[in-house]
Amino acid sequence: MNNIMIGRFVPGDSWIHRLDPRTKMIGTFIFIFVMLWSTLWATYAWSAAFVVLAIRLTKQPFRLYWDGLKPIFWLILFTVVLQLFFTPGTPVLLHAGPLKVTIPGIINAIYVMIRFVLIILMSTILTLTTPPTSIANALESLLKPLKKIHVPVAELSLMLSIALRFVPLLMDETQKIMNAQKSRGMSFSTGGPIKRAKAIVPLLIPLFVGALQRALDLANAMEVRGFQDATQRTKYRVLSYGSNDRSAFIGLIGFTIIFIGIKFFIK
Amino acid sequence: MAINFEQVNFSYGAGTTLAQPILHDINVTIPDGQVTAIIGQTGSGKSTFIQHLNGLLKPTTGRVVIDDFVLTSDLKEKNLTSLRARVGMVFQFPENQLFANTVLEDVMYAPINFGYAKADAEFAAKTALKQVNVSEELWDKSPFELSGGQMRRVAMAGTLASNPDIIVLDEPAAGLDPKGQKELLAIVRGLKEAGKLVVFISHQMDHVIAVADHVIVMHDGGVVAEGTPVEIFNKDLVWFKTVALDLPKAGQFAEQLRQKGHILRHRPLLLTELATMLNEEKRHE
Amino acid sequence: MVKAIKIDNLKYSYDERSLFSDFNLDIDAGQWVALVGHNGSGKSTLAKLILGLLVAEQGDIDVFDERLTVETVHHVRSKIGMVFQNPDNQFVGATVADDVAFGLENIQVESSEMPQKIDNALTIVGMQEFKNREPHTLSGGQKQRVALASVLALQPKIIILDEATAMLDPDGRATVMETLQKLKKQFGKELTLVTITHDMDEATLADRVVVINDGQKILDGTPAEVFSQRKALHENGLELPFANELAFHLNEKPNKYMDERELIQWLSTLNK
């Protein structure tokens, strides 16, 4: 029921699950950055192999990763089609006005698709193995240096974790309000576009009002429990790197070195 | 004009890998012109059950027949409007559904959606507001300026305004103080007197014994008992434990007396009954 | 006798209507006071005034001899814990443990000391097995017990429960009340408890009942004293607890105030 989480987290005990969330975030960024330099089938293959290894290490069925790709399917298709029909070059296979199917076009299309898929898969590894609040904690820790330029990292991070905690509740409430208004005859499926747009008001207003009331109540509760300055707080969940993280970083460096090696040697 | 559940089964996400069966083999009739209470512990399927009464949910297999309207799994959303005009549903904490600029506008929302002309909708709204004792001076105010109790009554009026024959209420007394609870029960009785078919979910057995004519007991997604409140509340205690329900307060009190060796002639369900029985004992001594 | 809370000449208006005018209330340390009134009587507003969430126009509020002012408000709050009515709107953490930790983080407890304090607080309310659960998997009663634990972890001298059971089902209400009774027994005079409610069966548990309507004190005394005023209670939108209403209807009544347990005992011995 209502399991549409933003990047669904699945609890588990794999090596990847146990990594520090910062390691996973940094790893995802590094992988994507490096992978985007890929121009040869060999580097794509190497990147794909790395992702497959990572997926195996999460000990989760591939079906879950496939589910992560499904929402992006149309976007991938759209980009692939663009590459397919609009890449200049020779030899040309089909020609119809501005549309041109060329061999370089086909190759580019395949490469674009692989890039998309690998990026999504890698991000899914992150969200599948890391609870949202750990991601928020990791972000707070990684963005700490920004405090020097007066970015309110502590406040933003607290806002993020509280907001995340309310996601399931807000989804439930949306369903309840929709049920209440549907019961009073609200319909999204009839009428012209203007009527349908107006139909959203009886859904949005109660949600907003509810959210505002919740914010007020929460603020009171937080104050009463001693909240004053977001920057003057200790932390219950302290992140610390372990030996697993060291191995993970070594693995990442290894991936990058071999990637660069392939690029230079197969040229 | 009764409601019939015929071999109804319901699962969330039926047909997918995440299917969650909730209701099993429901065969039950909700009688016309009476107040029926649906009771059962949290998770017994009561909310899922009542959402079949106005088509918010459709049976996965089986059918729900509401008067002459047949609800099956393949019915399209657009065909449900006529059902919802006849079955009004008041959810728990209904004040959360208020949205309009004025009280009157909010209460007119349902009638207008169901095709009333503006003047008729206004009249219907005013009638409904009077029915739930929301005074005229509040009609032009923003619903958000009202007290919690007033907001709840406005929300109820919002459902009554389309003049449904069947009214369903999910825990209508939740969060109300004693006075508010009394007023709520009076409204329910008023609906019955007006000839409506009323269904309500409640955790408060004292309310059930006060207004219900008929009781349906749910447990683990199925209907395990049906009858008048007196019949249900006279079942043995072991049964009550298995379905995780309580007796009305008077019954609980009498049970505690019985455990101390003071046994009454029969199980009282109302405070006045209990007092009368205790007084009669004294006279026989 | 040390006064836990002392309210003098309180004046407060809401929406241009006067709610409290010259309101006085003293609560002794270690007392369990039930503040009762129908919805809208002003009882919740009083709680917010005591905690400085609302500011009175006139009057003084002292908490354990410390005057509540703009400067002292944070220190005063450190002596009081409050559990609010809506179980979801006070649950800050992503899990039960995180929520209890929230208060500890605010007062800058060392990270290494937190797990123990969290465990202790959760054990008192019987929720330690739910430590890693997310709030949307908990019932209302469970969430309120977590709220109590979050408050207990800060070791307040006073706990105020503002209609903490109003949104719960009978089961949830019962578990919260059981937990409160256990708490009061465990901490005795060290804990001052103020329960704000409109449920008279809950009010029976207190040492003292204060009835409020329209910002005015209507009745103030022991449960025995207050529940003998059936007419006054009805006039103020309240009812008697079940046992007392029953006793009222009996031809042969007990000669003194009895709560439910005592009445059952009395009735059962009569029959033997």
UniProtKB/Swiss-Prot annotation, chain B:
Protein family per UniProt: Belongs to the ABC transporter superfamily. Energy-coupling factor EcfA family.
Organism this protein belongs to: Leuconostoc mesenteroides subsp. mesenteroides (strain ATCC 8293 / DSM 20343 / BCRC 11652 / CCM 1803 / JCM 6124 / NCDO 523 / NBRC 100496 / NCIMB 8023 / NCTC 12954 / NRRL B-1118 / 37Y)
UniProt keyword annotations, A-Z: ATP-binding, Cell membrane, Membrane, Nucleotide-binding, Translocase, Transport
Main localization category: membrane
Domain ABC transporter: 3-245
Oligomeric and partner information: Forms a stable energy-coupling factor (ECF) transporter complex probably composed of 2 membrane-embedded substrate-binding proteins (S component), 2 ATP-binding proteins (A component) and 2 transmembrane proteins (T component). This complex interacts with a number of substrate-specific components, including FolT, PanT and RibU for 5-formyltetrahydrofolate, pantothenate and riboflavin respectively.
Name this protein carries in UniProt: Energy-coupling factor transporter ATP-binding protein EcfA2
Gene3D superfamilies: P-loop containing nucleotide triphosphate hydrolases
Domain of life: Bacteria
Stored InterPro entries: AAA+_ATPase, ABC_transporter-like_ATP-bd, ABC_transporter-like_CS, ABC_transpr_CbiO/EcfA_su, ECF_ABC_transporter_ATP-bd, EcfA2, P-loop_NTPase
A GO molecular-function descriptor: ATP hydrolysis activity
Binding site for ATP: G40, Q41, T42, G43, S44, G45, K46, S47
Compartments it resides in: Cell membrane
E.C. code: 7.-.-.-
Gene Ontology cellular component list: ATP-binding cassette (ABC) transporter complex
Membrane topology per record: Peripheral membrane protein
The UniProt record lists the keyword Hydrolase: no
From Swiss-Prot, chain C:
Subcellular localization: Cell membrane
GO cellular component assignments: ATP-binding cassette (ABC) transporter complex
Membrane topology value: Peripheral membrane protein
Organism: Leuconostoc mesenteroides subsp. mesenteroides (strain ATCC 8293 / DSM 20343 / BCRC 11652 / CCM 1803 / JCM 6124 / NCDO 523 / NBRC 100496 / NCIMB 8023 / NCTC 12954 / NRRL B-1118 / 37Y)
InterPro entries: AAA+_ATPase (IPR003593), ABC_transporter-like_ATP-bd (IPR003439), ABC_transporter-like_CS (IPR017871), ABC_transpr_CbiO/EcfA_su (IPR015856), ECF_ABC_transporter_ATP-bd (IPR050095), EcfA_1 (IPR030947), P-loop_NTPase (IPR027417)
Similarity annotation: Belongs to the ABC transporter superfamily. Energy-coupling factor EcfA family.
Gene3D superfamilies the UniProt entry points to: P-loop containing nucleotide triphosphate hydrolases (3.40.50.300)
Primary localisation category: membrane
Keyword Membrane: yes
SMART domains: AAA (SM00382)
ABC transporter domain ranges (all copies): 5-239
Function (record text): ATP-binding (A) component of a common energy-coupling factor (ECF) ABC-transporter complex. Unlike classic ABC transporters this ECF transporter provides the energy necessary to transport a number of different substrates including 5-formyltetrahydrofolate, pantothenate and riboflavin. Expression of the complex plus FolT in E.coli allows 5-formyltetrahydrofolate uptake; 5-formyltetrahydrofolate is not taken up in the absence of FolT or the EcfA1A2T complex.
Enzyme class: translocase
Protein name from the UniProt record: Energy-coupling factor transporter ATP-binding protein EcfA1
CDD domains in the cross-refs: ABC_cobalt_CbiO_domain1
PROSITE patterns named among the record's database cross-references: ABC_TRANSPORTER_1 (PS00211), ABC_TRANSPORTER_2 (PS50893), CBIO (PS51246)
A GO MF label: ATP binding
Subunit structure: Forms a stable energy-coupling factor (ECF) transporter complex probably composed of 2 membrane-embedded substrate-binding proteins (S component), 2 ATP-binding proteins (A component) and 2 transmembrane proteins (T component). This complex interacts with a number of substrate-specific components, including FolT, PanT and RibU for 5-formyltetrahydrofolate, pantothenate and riboflavin respectively.
EC number: 7.-.-.-
Record lineage: Bacteria, Bacillati, Bacillota, Bacilli, Lactobacillales
Residue positions of the active site: E163 (proton acceptor)
Residues that coordinate or bind ATP: G37, H38, N39, G40, S41, G42, K43, S44
Keywords of this entry: ATP-binding, Cell membrane, Membrane, Nucleotide-binding, Translocase, Transport
